[in-house]
Amino acid sequence: MYEIIFTDKAKKQFLKLEKNNQERIGSVLERIKIRPEHFVERLVGEFGYKLRIGDYRLILDIDKNKLIILVLKVGHRKNIYK
């Protein structure tokens, strides 16, 4: 099972979200711990992955050797890629 780690920036972004969105994202993160490749999409032109949860996106890096999912950014789909 993968371990999920937030960067400091991602943690601040996550905590700024409304409580119901935090709970929804937390629920999905619990499910992806087992097989993240079934839930994420590779980013085009960059290394890393995106996870879609409603109108929100998480930018992730996955280390398959260490079994770590690193959450790099959390935000609304309008702003996350800027």
Regions found by a protein language model. Name each.
Residues 28-52:
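A short, surface-exposed loop/turn module that caps and links secondary-structure elements
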Residues 1-12, 16-23, 34, 53, ...:
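Enriched for short, Lys/Arg-rich terminal
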